Structure formats: C-alpha cells, structure tokens
Amino acid sequence: MSVEKRTPISVKEAIKRIMKQHVEVKNININLDESLGHILAEDIVATYDIPRFNKSPYDGFAIRSEDSQGASGENRIEFEVIDHIGAGSVSEKTIDKNQAIRIMTGAQIPSGADAVVMFEQTIESETTFTIRKSFKHLENISLQGEEIKAGDIVLHKGMRINSGVIAVLATYGYTKVRVARKPTVAVIATGSELLEVEDELEPGKIRNSNGPMIKALAKQFGIQVGMYKVQHDNLEKSIEVVKKALSEHDLVITTGGVSVGDFDYLPEIYKSIQAQILFNKVAQRPGSVTTVAFADGKYLFGLSGNPSACYTGFELYVKPAVNKLMGAKACYPQIIKATLMEDFNKANPFTRLIRAKATLTKAGMTVIPSGFNKSGAVVAIAHANAMIMLPGGTRGFKAGNIVDVILTESNSFEEELIL
C-alpha cells in the first residue's frame, strides 16, 4: 500500500469543515418528562404574564401605602387585620383606611392594597398591628409581568432542555414538547491487535478500550449507541461493516486504521463508499491523523486507535457534530482560562492537548496534567475532567502561567467557535 502524503490543517479549520456540512435535523414530539437533554425545535411564546398577577414576595400584611405615611418610632400607626389569605387564595375583601389583610408569600395582592409590610416590621396583637416606618407605593410587591409579558419568546429554538427549561414548559402547560430527534451513533473498533473486553490476554494483543469509552462518551449526551464487533485488519470485511453501520445510524465512529501503516484501511474504506474526505491530518498532538469524512448526509469519524488521541478527537470533533445533529444553537467547546499548577517543558510544534484535572478554588480555576502524557495513555483519561490546550509554536510552560482549558465533563457549549 502506497503511503499517502497528508497536509495538516489547524484544529479550528478542522472544526469549521465539519460544521459547514449540511445535515438533516429531524423533529419529534415527546413527553415533557422525557425531554431532559433534548434540544428545543421551536420557540416557546409566553401565553400569559409572569407573574400572572401582583403578588406578595413575603409573609406579611397587605396595606394601603398612604395609610403608613408619617409612621415613626415615636408615632406608630395601627392597622386592623380584616382577612387572612394564603398562596392560591384570593381575598374577596377590599382594604379601606388603616385596614390590612394578612398575606402569605405568593398570594395575590388584595383589592385596595399597594404595599406589603413584612411580619418582622410589625408589633402584633390579636386583631391589629403597628408599624414605625412609612411604605412607598408598590413596595414589597412582585408586579404582574415583571419577568415575562404575554407574547414574549420565553425559550428559543436550539436551547438545550435542562431543569429550568422544564420548569418553564410546565408553567405554560406543555405536556408534549417539540424537540430535535437525537442521532444514533455506530461505534466500530478496528485492528488485529484488539481483543474483546471479556477475552483472555494473548501475546501482542490488547483489549478494546476505545469502543466502551466512545460508547460512554456518546451516552453522556443521552444518545443511542450501536456497538459493532471488533473488526480485524481485513479490508473487505471492514468495508462491509462500515456500510452496514452507515445505513443503520446517523453517524459512524471508527477507532484505529487512520494512520499510514500497511494495515490502515480507512482511506480505502472511505473511497469505496464514495465519502468526501473533509480532512485527514490535523496540526495537533495527540490525534494528528484524525480523519473525518461525509457521505449521504452523514458524518464518518476516523479516530486514532491510541486511547488518549481517540478521547481528544471525540471531545474536539465529535461533540460539535453531535450538537449540530441534535439541532443545538450552542455547539462548540467552552474554553476557559486556568492557572497551570506544574511546569510543562515539552515543545509544542502543533497544538497540544493534555488530559488534565481542573479544580475551582477561591482564587480561581487551576489545572494540572492528570498523568502520563502520551497518545497511548489510558489511565490519565480516568483522572481527567479537562484538556489543557497549548498553542503550536510554543516551548515550555511554567507553573503559574495562564492556559486555555476545555472542561470535558461540562454540558455547556458556546454558540461561536472561540479557538
């Protein structure tokens, strides 16, 4: 097999090439209690104000503010309590001069009242109370529509549904929600050196760790994963299984077979299914031979067989694509600044991604490499919740330097690519 010359592109350009492809986002209706983690497929318009009515934010007494004018420590003003209302109840009485209604948090302000006195601001007797300060018009009142007005867009298409979104949907009576259907992902590990997880070890062999790892990463999105048997280095069989996976799923991820060795068949597989190669080399370490193709409106990700490189490829390239397929408005990795806690002296001819442990402290975010830092590392991934991103063309970072970090355990994404 002839060795193909590959021209590397930047990480940013690689992500752009993935995201510019046109993909079909299919919408479905699901039950509200099944919608967590999905993406809204339509704007949600408020059908009424929030709050729906003027209400009390405190336990206290509803009064007319004009009756409190002139109150002081030397001139306490007395009010007669004529009713008592809790949240969900409405008083039928109208407050007159120096009258008050005992009111609980969330209850509707009764007719005639325009202020609320908190219990702790009063001295109570059996049917009366006194105050020593005056109150302004609408003091201590939550006003109708102060948060949302009827007709406002309260939730936007492309938002990820979290607990707060579910609260809003429930508020407006949505038992069914229009969402983007989550894609299904096929995972295929390749390589004659691979054994299944349950197999006994043999000389020169390793167990397939990438397949279960990719499955777990995909399931963090709550998407269905189809696992295919480990494919050994046989071109015809590999082509057959990739075609099958492509016909059964929305996205195909293979691990291994992306390098330039005699048994790395991915270029031939893509050629046989007439896939468009978006890129096959990225100026990054690890994972420089990450390859992404597009066929029949579907992505094919060829990730490295080295575990850390495979993990890096999923975080950088698969996640934005899955977000796009889910109809998300925010698709891109969230990058933050953190203080490096130990020296990293290795040269970085290309963008370097380091598995790391990020910690939020009182002084801010800190980050430290999580262990052995080579592309084949496995254990370092288990202790990582982040990736340090060091720019190409640099050499030597010292403890105390500020570095870019991707929080890999975060479910927050950016609308713009900020690499």
UniProtKB/Swiss-Prot annotation:
It comes from the Bacteria. Belongs to the MoeA family. GO terms for biological process: Mo-molybdopterin cofactor biosynthetic process. PANTHER family: GEPHYRIN, MOLYBDOPTERIN BIOSYNTHESIS PROTEIN. Keywords: Magnesium, Metal-binding, Molybdenum, Molybdenum cofactor biosynthesis, Transferase. It catalyses: adenylyl-molybdopterin + molybdate = Mo-molybdopterin + AMP + H(+). Its cofactor is Mg(2+). GO terms for molecular function: metal ion binding; molybdopterin molybdotransferase activity. Binds 1 Mg(2+) ion per subunit. It is an enzyme of class 2 (transferase). One of its GO terms (cellular component) is cytosol. Pathway: Cofactor biosynthesis; molybdopterin biosynthesis. It holds the Pfam family MoCF_biosynth. Catalyzes the insertion of molybdate into adenylated molybdopterin with the concomitant release of AMP. This is Molybdopterin molybdenumtransferase. The keyword Metal-binding applies. InterPro entries: MoaB/Mog-like_dom_sf, MoaB/Mog_dom, MoeA-like, MoeA_C_domain_IV, MoeA_C_domain_IV_sf, MoeA_linker/N, MoeA_linker/N_sf. Its EC number is 2.10.1.1.
